[in-house]
């Protein structure tokens, strides 16, 4: 036996190199035999159609370290355990026996291999989620008759102060265009693109002229620039600024009012987590999830901070994936709009959307106003309303509003010009007939016994999904940039949550379809 003395001045001890008898059991089955989730992830992956997944690696050249099916199993399992970064997944592949079992003797992939694989499956993850939901439907774990929808904002992986505002861009663009039109004598009716085209044409002509005349440009102190050089530099500056403004507006598109310079798909939104209490805007994505029977059945990633504009495109996607299976749509007050009501009616879906004035309708002031409205008598011949004391409300105009989605709503405006009550000379009432009709139907639905039960399930299932993501898995900020990456990330998270839910049901020996009952 050889003694090695440590000569460090900080410690004084002796290290002994001795022989240690190791007893290793290479049968990992012994250690993971009771892990339901591990066996479940393998069983589910085996039932998926992974033809496209197997094509992500080329059949030519070097063989991949780990085959794509095993890589998918590893990523889904790690996500279900709250492990998201490539380096943490790499560490799990090296030291976690459960992941070693999935690898089945293969070499542990490094973080670059894991990241490359995630990039290769960006377009495949939505279909994998859809296939998993179909398996759960076949196993009688999901009933799609009631869909519970909710949304949340998750911060993007972008710098918080990298904002570009539409208002600022449009303001400076307008000022510059006015200046250019005045200097160049252009028509006031020209659009920004036409002004840019005119400036570019003049700039190119001047550049060609300077080249032909061999005009020398000078820079620095004590140098006097020619008129041609000054005009050239001014036109170049105008051209570059106009192109920059146009690029900013193109990135934002028609519906957004901001974007981040470090993640062009992220929009600045007001978050619930406001530690400074100043309403600070942060770059984020609006994430929509649809739940049924405790499982996530669909996702939607939106630039728009309002939930109202996300419902219609989200439902189109769900109807395409699960044709003829959806019956009831349950959502909170943020989704209420005439456009959404009409879409639900056209697709024969029952609305359980909570009216945005539901809490306000319980106040004494609102009840008094509604009592006044209900006592009005409508005269069809004159198209006017008459109050109980004979006051006439004459239809003055129709107010049309064009929403960002392109949908146009019409509100009829009736005014009484001789009201002379409560300090008011006139009084107006505004009636949106289509919206009011659907709102009353939805209100009736949510107040019924069935509606109370559906609202209870929405609050538990839909909001519970985001609780599991943010609190359960501690996922409060994305780790990737770009909408395509975010969609893939949300799909993987949804698959992981579904895996956890099914594991919990199996361990608790409760495989009935989840439906919470009102007390």
Model-derived features: where do they sit?
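Short helix-loop boundary/capping segments at the starts of domains
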Residues: 46-54, 77-84, 95-102
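Anion-binding and metal-coordination hotspots
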Residues: 15, 75, 82-95, 106-519
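Basic, short loop/linker segments at the boundary and entry of helix-turn-helix/winged-helix-like folds
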Residues: 32-76
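Short, flexible loop/hinge motifs at secondary-structure junctions
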Residues: 1-27, 180, 204, 219, ...
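Short, charged, low-complexity loops and linkers
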Residues: 23-32, 448-453
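Catalytic micro-motifs at enzyme active sites that drive phosphoryl/nucleotidyl and oxygen chemistry
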Residues: 63, 100-106, 134
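A ubiquitous short alpha-helical element
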Residues: 11, 57-62, 450-453
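Short secondary-structure transition/capping motifs
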Residues: 30, 62-67, 78-82, 103, ...
């Amino acid at each position: 036996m050889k003694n090695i003395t440590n000569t460090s001045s900080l410690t004084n001890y002796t290290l002994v190199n001795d022989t240690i008898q190791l007893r290793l059991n290479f049968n990992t089955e012994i250690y993971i035999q009771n892990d339901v989730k591990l066996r479940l992830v393998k069983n589910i992956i085996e039932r998926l159609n992974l033809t496209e997944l197997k094509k992500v690696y080329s059949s030519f050249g070097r063989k991949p370290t780990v085959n794509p099916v095993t890589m998918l199993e590893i990523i889904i399992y790690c996500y279900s355990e709250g492990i998201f970064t490539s380096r943490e997944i790499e560490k799990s592949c090296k030291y976690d026996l459960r992941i070693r079992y999935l690898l089945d003797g293969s070499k542990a992939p490094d973080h670059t291999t894991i990241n490359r694989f995630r990039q290769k499956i960006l377009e495949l993850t939505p279909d994998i989620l859809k296939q998993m939901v179909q398996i759960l439907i076949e196993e009688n774990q999901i009933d799609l008759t009631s869909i519970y929808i909710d949304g949340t904002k998750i911060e993007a992986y972008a710098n918080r102060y990298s904002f570009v505002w539409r208002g600022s861009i449009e303001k400076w663009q307008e000022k510059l265009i006015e200046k250019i039109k005045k200097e160049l004598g252009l028509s006031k009716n020209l659009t920004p693109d036409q002004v840019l085209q005119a400036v570019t044409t003049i700039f190119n002509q001047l550049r060609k002229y300077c080249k032909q005349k061999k005009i020398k440009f000078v820079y620095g102190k004590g140098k006097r620039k020619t008129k041609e050089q000054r005009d050239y530099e001014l036109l170049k500056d105008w051209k570059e600024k106009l192109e920059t403004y146009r690029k900013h507006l193109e990135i934002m598109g028609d519906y957004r009012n901001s974007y981040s310079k470090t993640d062009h798909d992220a929009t600045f939104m007001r978050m619930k987590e406001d530690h400074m209490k100043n309403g600070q805007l942060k770059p984020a994505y609006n994430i929509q999830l649809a739940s049924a029977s405790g499982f996530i059945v669909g996702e939607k990633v939106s630039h728009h901070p309002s939930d109202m504009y996300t419902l219609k495109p989200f439902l189109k996607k769900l109807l395409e994936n699960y044709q003829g299976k959806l019956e009831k749509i349950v959502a909170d007050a943020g989704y209420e709009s005439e456009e959404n009501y009409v879409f639900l009616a056209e697709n024969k879906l029952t609305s359980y959307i909570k009216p945005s004035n539901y809490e306000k309708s319980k106040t004494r002031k609102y009840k008094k106003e509604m009592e006044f409205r209900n006592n009005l008598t409508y005269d069809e011949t004159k198209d006017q309303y008459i109050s109980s004391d004979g006051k006439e409300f004459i239809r003055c105009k129709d107010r049309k509003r064009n929403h960002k989605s392109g949908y146009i709503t019409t509100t009829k405006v009736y005014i009484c010009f001789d009201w002379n009550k409560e300090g008011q000379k006139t009084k107006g009432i505004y009636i949106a007939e289509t919206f009011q009709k659907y709102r009353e139907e939805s209100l009736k639905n949510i107040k019924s016994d069935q509606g109370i039960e559906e609202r209870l399930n929405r609050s538990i299932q839909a909001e519970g999904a985001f609780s599991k993501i943010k609190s359960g898995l501690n996922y409060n900020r994305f780790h990737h940039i770009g909408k395509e990456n975010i969609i893939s990330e949300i799909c993987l998270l949804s698959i992981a949550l579904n895996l956890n839910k099914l594991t919990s049901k199996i361990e608790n020996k409760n495989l009935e379809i989840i439906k919470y009952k009102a007390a």
